[in-house]
């Protein structure tokens, strides 16, 4: 009888300790993500075409599925070609669903716009628990689809520009048109996570950034602070969004010849464009790294994300270095206790300034 009881208890313990048994539900948060726009370059912008060879890898790094909806059939080859390019550069074991919408935008100056759909925070596998990751990036890190009901990327193609788009995939875009494959490659970059979640109030000159992305963690002010660590909302953050910001990630710096890549932060804030792009003046003439600048010139073609963008995404997939502490941590919030006969367990939420004061652990 004693042996039987021991065996039963042992079996129960083994079952309870099994990683697949009675697992607590994972807790994470998600919020809607904004759209980022891709604009036509100003009329008269000169562009010297530089031939860029299309690059192929033997194996795709991810499976990207497309829902074309009402997109015209003649657009599909260029869109598929752009998707194939990114499937060779973005690694994920979780399939990525893309929604293509063909619809009129607010201005014909907008070629297209893209959104990751949602940001996710606090999921198992997140490199940093205080950062909000774009859906495709979050799924890649988590190893599973955190939101199976919704696409990871949504791209809006401006239907009012139909006659000005080049739909071929051979790179021979005439100077009178805009290359659709290049547009989609750019927009997919945003959809996969190349974007800030900051916002700007032009009436008061204040900026806000309540849910920073990994992009915001690597965007750096001249004084060395991370963009995500500037008080939000504040006039100081508004000033930061309209002054010099650079990329501080090690991979991006290495690929950019040891120089911190400059981000696009015009003095007059541009909604849907500022911060979430590489600097136009610095990179628009680059043979390989002009992909994520905010404007596309007539006849401009790129059939690869470029080494700098790929390196910056690699930076975003790991935990960013701690920022510069600003002030001492304030008192914890919502403190409560579970009191027992011989012990008590305390529960609390982080101080309101935990991020800027660089609180990482509690002892």
Please give the residue ranges for each predicted region.
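Bacterial N-terminal signal peptides
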Residues: 8-16
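Intrinsically disordered, low-complexity segments
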Residues: 4, 16-19, 341, 358
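Extracellular zinc-dependent metalloprotease catalytic-domain scaffold
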Residues: 22-185, 191-323
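Bacterial N-terminal signal peptides that target proteins for export
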Residues: 1-8
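Pro/Thr/Ser/Gly-rich low-complexity, intrinsically disordered linker/stalk tracts
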Residues: 323-360
